[in-house]
Amino acid sequence: MLKKKIGKIVTASAVTACVLVNATAAMLPSMSMVAFAGQELGQMDFNDGVGLPWHICESGPGKMKFNIDGGTYNIEIVEPGGAAKGGESRWDCQFRHRGLILEAGHTYEVKAEVTADHDGQIYTKIGDSGSPYREPWHNGYGGNEGNGWNCMQVTANKTLKIESTFTCTENIEVGEWAWQFGGAGQHQSTDCFPAGTKLKFDNMSLIDKTDDKTDYDVLHPKKDVPEGQVRVNQVGYFSTLQKQATAVVENGTAAQKFSLLDASGKEVYTGTSSATRYDEDSQQYIQVLDFSDFTTAGTYTISCGGKGSYSFKIGNDVYDGILTDAVNYFYQNRSGIDLEEKYITSTGMNESKADLVHVAGHVPDTAYIQSKWIKSYKADGSDVDKSSGTLNGQGGWYDAGDHGKYVVNGGISIWTLNNMYERVLDSDNNSKESKWADNSGTVVIPENGNKIPDILDETKVEMDWMMEMVVPSGYKMTYDASAYGGSDTGKYENMVFHKLHDHKWTGLGVRPNDYADEWGTIRIVKPPSTAATLNFVANAAQTARLWKDIDSTYADKLLKQAKLSYEAAKANPELYAPLDQAIGGGAYGDTNVKDDFYWAACELYATTKDSSYLTDMKGYADCFKVTTNLEGGENNGSFSSFNWGNTAGLGSLTMYLNRDILDAADAKTLSDSIKKAADTYIAKEEEQGYGIPYQGATFTDAINLGYDDSGKLIEVNGYEWGSNSFVVNNAIVMAYAYDITKDAKYIDGVSTAMDYVFGRNAMDFSYVTGYGTYHCENPHHRFWSHELDSTFPYAPSGVMSGGANSGIQDPYVRGMGYKLGTLAPQLCYIDSVEAWSVNEVTINWNSPFAWVVSFLEDEAPLVDRDTPATTAKTTEGGTTSTTTSTGTALYGDVDCNGKIEINDIVLLSRYVAQDATAKAPTAQGLINADCENNGSIDAGDITAIARYLAHLCEASELGPQ
């Protein structure tokens, strides 16, 4: 989340990057306005309901609400801020337009109107966005002429009109027009306005009377994006997998022909669309176009009903390069090292890889250890607790767009990348260990050449940082159980601190090595939590398991600390991280840690085989299960199997990879649960117009959305923050189902999920930088801030945006005129670095993105749809087989003699009972045995055959219905 401060150098390209003008243009507010020669502003009268590039800017504790209605930009001051309340001054509440260029010797005409419903003061200035803070015009005067730093007086309900001219004496290349009306502080003896004041802005104008070379329309020409109504995976489709596109049509359109065209425009395939149906998540009428049976490699487009698509490829190499770029995200977000050009794998939209290098940040990363949870600190940091000493938290990964480092988010990210590697050690799939071998080229990092799998080198960076977050002896804290719930023992040694970040927010366009002095930030470590401790335990145990044959000393060190920290967590089972600690860093609150205990026990059991951990695992209600509904913490019925706040699914997937230490019944429960979850996601894909294995939820956001006028939390029904992360996490579950069954429907499900990410969505937009014709360019990131400041780089390729979010919490998105509940979930997106609620990137989103890409590039080329797929899974209690077929089955004919008879019941009964003296059914026999068509062979199938032999059902009622 972004809280910006007055005076940060930026060059806002504003609306250019934010307006996704394509096939959804009709869904977006119009940006049309009357143009004037020399007009420097991108918006003047707000008559079309759009505010951008004008936007509010808050610095805590300053807070505002706004809307764009009635032809004015309307702002309510909720809290003016100011030094006495922990802020700075009047710039705690601002309204501004950035991206201005002013030229020496040019004369400018300024006009504006502002009305307030209370008497007060306001300061307005045109000049530098940051140092050296030149102001060729403020408050109607050029320079400091006749005004100094004083404000203009505003009379309640009387419009203040400004009409002025000035001549600029110096070139200003990074300029802004800002209005300041916050609290008392430097240069401001009183609050500008009381809380509750409402202001209206209108008829803004800044005209260069000398020439029009820096007109807004000249500097920010509209992007000419081809309009198409056929949405495809813009990267491409694997030859042997399902291939579907979505056409946007009018209601009532009949099923119609579509054509696949090669690069020369020649028609090479035709098909017929599905019937027209309404897609709720896009609020569009759509037809699905299926061309799965076309397998010829090449580059193509689709034509349907006179509309076309972006180009895409078909082949088995369509994802080449993506994995390397996706995992390079982690190198480029390392803390505490100089980034070097030779380890950067892509240029993105930059001129060269050299644009992406920077000097090491936070060396050392000295942070003050906090003894209590404090929601916000004073801007000057005078109330930061320094009595508990410091911790050097150097290293690790920066979490997202900010410079914070968080144990719980690092936890799932380490697990996902480690799990991606551990999966290749399973001989039952087609992934090769050599892919991750040292110096293989998949992962490009400074550790190449040390004879250690490179992906493990990368996760070790974060694991080693976590080790630094372990609580030392003697630490004391004050925990407010009445406010946060849970309980406190007062003994914290071997617990783990929750997070490390700045004491307040910084702005965008900052380098990790040089912002602290300018922004006045202090690094802090928040108190320990049970959730952070258990994340550490799980990661340390998992990492120890993978390193034991590589570096036993390191593995032993991790495992020893994991055991100690696990016992510390059991002694503090309810030391919760509050949900509201979101100033200076993400909150990452968690008040339900039963799932974390289960995950930690799973990892410890998989590593040690100590039965005490198995006992702990079995105390969890959903032991050996993968669910599709996340509850607790920040989730309220999220349609997914795991995320950073709900980690039980991680433990279950770990146990699947280590199923040889489970008994047959537990192994079967686990595999059946994975398949059931995957089937749920496939069913959702088939229901959705764009094939997304996700659905929205009803959620609240006390921090960013707050409460309505009656004091009730504002509820949103739609896509959640980081919706794309749910898509790729759910794809991982389908991938495991494919590993279990080798049933192509599951890998089709994985591929279909990625189709959505790469462009088959309502935005007709690839959410991954550098991949797809029309792709993400400006994710929310402090260093990758070229959109705002041309001295900073664009993001590299291979970065996945969080995507559509019905909460649209940030003022930039709201500045488009979007209002809660009025826009289709899939359309709640803008590609801007300032749109932190919809365009954030983070380690726990890029890790599953990399996982899924890795899976598909290994497995997709080897899918065989012409033969039954049988996979034997060896367990401690025996062998179970799961077989699927695309051929013909006689359900009930277990012994494959062409008849259904009592012998089939006998054979199947002995198989289910694991009678080692009996001959097992053949692969086809197991297909025939699945009479309930649920992907498992059990007593229910025996009953089904018995019902048939007793003439209680027809043969046609066995198997698929």
Question: Residues of each region from the PLM?
Answer:
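Extracellular glycan-recognition surfaces and repeat-rich motifs
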Residues: D45-A83
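Cellulosome-associated attachment modules in secreted, modular CAZymes
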Residues: V21, L28, T867-Q961
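Extra-cytoplasmic beta-strand recognition segments
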Residues: M44-D48, F95-I122, I162-C168, N203-M204
